[in-house]
């Protein structure tokens, strides 16, 4: 795999994906869609990868969504058309390894395909979030539907309906739970890597089972989610694990946030 629209590397059980079209605001085109299909397959199947860091080159934007100049290939038959999110979104590609998104600059429109299915989002102080669809006369549906699963409905509607007329600041994104940490730009990537190293050091099966149980619960009733979660603990936790001597587990120097 030798992608041209992103940089991809694996080290110390961490896959680092860098959107690498800064001249086009890291917008996605057909090539990027195809490359993400391969990337998510690699991440899903490579047991050496425990966690993913998704970041973007350049200072102006994490991503502004679809490349409106190049677009992407569409089937002529409307019933055969697919959404770009089917290629870009990690959970739709059955990736249950944690994804940490590090956002700087603008994150707009189709950028939410990544953000909506990230497990942890951190951003720089200059980050802004918005969805321009309605300003261009387009229905805003898929991105805000995904966003409504992680922030309050009223905030989702405000983002979707105000389009280009309002942007969510990093501070406001923190207040509404869109991001969990705001940092100076020069610290962003280092902090993402630090979080990734902490997660990657934990037992991979436990981490992936946890991610899958939580995300799948969002599409289920509470009782069904609890039954599925119980089965995952039985599958993912070896017999006798509950009786493990916890005194033998190393105690880290934990942090308070």
Where do the protein language model's features map onto the residues?
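Glycine- (often His-adjacent) and acidic-residue-rich active-site loop
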Residues: 56-94, 107, 135, 221, ...
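Histidine-centered beta-alpha loop that forms part of the nucleotide-sugar donor binding/catalytic region
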Residues: 20, 66, 104
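Hydrophobic/aromatic residues within transmembrane alpha-helices
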Residues: 17, 54, 67, 114-116, ...
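Crotonase-fold acyl-CoA enzyme core
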Residues: 93-204
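Conserved CoA-thioester-binding segment of acyl-CoA-metabolizing enzymes
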Residues: 1-59
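Ligand-binding pocket scaffold of soluble enzyme catalytic domains
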Residues: 28, 75, 126
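C-terminal alpha-helix plus adjacent terminal tail
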Residues: 1-12, 59, 70, 164-172, ...
């Amino acid at each position: 795999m030798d992608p041209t629209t992103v940089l991809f590397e694996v080290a110390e059980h961490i896959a680092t994906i860098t959107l690498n079209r800064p001249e086009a605001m890291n917008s996605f085109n057909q090539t990027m869609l195809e490359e993400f299909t391969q990337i998510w397959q690699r991440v899903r199947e490579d047991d050496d990868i425990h966690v993913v860091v998704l970041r973007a080159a350049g200072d102006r934007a994490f991503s502004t969504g679809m490349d409106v100049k190049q677009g992407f290939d569409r089937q002529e038959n409307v019933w055969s058309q697919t959404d770009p999110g089917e290629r870009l979104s990690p959970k739709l590609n059955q990736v249950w390894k944690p994804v940490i998104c590090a956002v700087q600059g603008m994150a707009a429109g189709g950028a939410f395909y990544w953000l909506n299915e990230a497990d942890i989002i951190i951003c720089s102080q200059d980050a802004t979030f918005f969805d321009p669809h309605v300003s261009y006369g387009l229905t805003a549906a898929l991105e805000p539907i995904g966003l409504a699963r992680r922030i309050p409905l009223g905030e989702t509607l405000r983002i979707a309906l105000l389009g280009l007329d309002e942007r969510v600041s990093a501070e406001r994104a923190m207040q509404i739970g869109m991001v969990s940490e705001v940092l100076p730009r020069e610290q962003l990537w280092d902090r993402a890597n630090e979080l990734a190293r902490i997660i990657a050091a934990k037992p991979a099966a436990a981490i992936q089972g946890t991610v899958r149980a939580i995300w799948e619960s969002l599409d289920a009733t509470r009782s069904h989610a609890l039954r599925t979660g119980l089965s995952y603990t039985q599958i993912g936790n070896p017999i006798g694990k509950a009786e493990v001597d916890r005194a033998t587990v190393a105690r880290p120097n934990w942090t308070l946030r």
